[in-house]
Amino acid sequence: MSTDSVTRIAHLSDLHCGSPHFKADLLERAIEEINELRPEVAVISGDLTTDGFEREYRTAREFVDRIECADLIVVPGNHDSRNVGYIHFEELFGPRAQTLHKHGLTIVAEDSSEPDLDHGQIGRNRYPHIEGEFAGFANLNLFVLHHHLLPIPGTGRERNIVYDAGDLLELLLRSRVKLVLAGHKHVPYAWHIESMFVVTTGTVSTLRLRGHGRPCYNVIEVGPEWVRIYRKYPFEGQEPIIEFSRETHEYEKHGLGAVT
């Protein structure tokens, strides 16, 4: 637990346990770095496995159990739902949708995966639940899913946003969501749309990378008046991405065009 007024969230994605590209030393180092930060919450936005097999899930669970935090939020990705893998997810990680009202945050996490398909959607049947979870709270609102909510440069021609992205964006903006966290295509990026930031992280522990990408994860620091987001590279330090005001929504971007 932080000793100051800052709440910290570690955001990891795309572990891909079982992949020939998986590097255990990267994940071990990331977990060491995260534990040094002592975050209140750890968020894992899917693709813990490569093919959804039970043995891959058990490996992922062993690593995740090493993360020291008060609250853990995990959703499945498209790889996790292969081979009926969502059954193993529920057995080892619990419900595929979670909500946390704590630490001055409201975090709603939803499963965007479809069995044996790479594309995803949330589905309008989930909209009333999502809107209800955000209603009546004065906290900082965050939404978590695996797939992209907006297109990401450098991710190819695959349709990798959720099919119902437009409706979901409108719902989240109406619900005063300030930050969306996702993974999926191993390309870290950030969009600013109206009063909301949509931030993806890359893969934390595989070398299945695009171009000059590097394994990475994000750390979010939430202060009383501001939010800061950093991109961290296991073994290789960190760089700031965004800082924004919780009240005025003014923001400062960092890096080479990382935020648009």
Predicted ranges, named:
Residues 157-228:
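Conserved beta-sheet core of the metallophosphoesterase superfamily
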Residues 137-154:
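Short acidic, glycine-rich surface-loop motifs adjacent to enzyme active sites
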Residues 1-10, 99-109, 135-142, 193-198:
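Beta-strand-turn-beta hairpins that frame and shape the catalytic cleft
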Residues 54-132, 171-173, 219:
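Extended active-site neighborhood of metal-dependent phosphoesterases/phosphodiesterases
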Residues 3, 223-260:
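A short C-terminal boundary segment appended to hydrolase-like catalytic domains
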Residues 12-13, 42-47, 71-78, 111, ...:
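Active-site neighborhood of phospho(di)ester-bond hydrolases with catalytic His/Asp-centered motifs
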Residues 1-65:
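N-terminal active-site segment of His-dependent metallophosphoesterases
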